Regions:
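Short beta-strand and adjacent tight-turn residues that come in two discontinuous sequence segments
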Residues: 122
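Acidic, metal-associated active-site segment
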Residues: 50, 104-116
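Short, well-structured N-terminal submotif of metal-dependent ribonuclease cores
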Residues: 1-44, 48-65, 69-100, 128-138, ...
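Asp-based, Mg2+/Mn2+-dependent phosphohydrolase catalytic module
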Residues: 143-168
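Short active-site oxyanion
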Residues: 36-39, 115-119
Length: 168
């Protein structure tokens, strides 16, 4: 079973810019894909969020990793429930945070990624939301933030994957 990875904009940008922790992640990603142990999925959110920075060529990078594999354009019933639970968690448990422009896009992307993927990257705030609502456990997803320890942990995790989805 091939594991499916959702890469958020932070990870794509880090790889494109050659940031330290991400520089070592890209070869691990490509190796896991080449072994048949990992698939990467594109989303409509990637297209919207990449538009302001065409110089980084994020979509080209993503397409090179995904091979054209796409997430569903819209969340299914499980995805809509995930989105509702994340929005509720933000409103009721994290109400002190001021909303940002990309929040709705993040919720949309994560709603699909959590219900259709195995490994999901997101920012630390959204990881707190997902974990607070226990959506990672419910949907059996592994979360990785853009913080250096998580980026390094993802690299190690990718090296462990086999085409059958088992760790050696």
């Amino acid at each position: 079973m091939t594991r499916l990875l959702y890469l958020d904009q932070n990870y794509l940008s880090g790889i494109a810019k050659g940031k330290a922790a991400f520089r070592d992640l890209e070869p691990a990603l490509r190796d896991a894909i080449a072994r048949g142990a990992l698939g990467v999925a594109e989303s409509a959110v990637h297209e919207r969020e990449s538009a302001p920075r065409p110089d980084l060529r994020l979509l080209e990078l993503l397409r090179g990793l995904s091979g054209g594999r796409r997430q569903p354009a819209e969340p299914d019933a499980a995805g809509r429930e995930v989105r509702r639970r994340m929005a509720w968690t933000i409103e009721h448990e994290l109400s002190g945070r001021r909303p940002r422009g990309g929040d709705a896009a993040d919720l949309d992307a994560l709603a699909v990624a959590l219900t259709h993927g195995d490994l999901v990257t997101c920012d630390a705030f959204n990881a707190d939301v997902v974990r607070g609502a226990r959506l990672d456990a419910r949907h059996r997803c592994e979360l990785f933030t853009g913080r250096r320890p998580d980026v390094l942990a993802l690299r190690v995790r990718l090296a462990e994957l086999t085409p059958e989805g088992e760790t050696p």
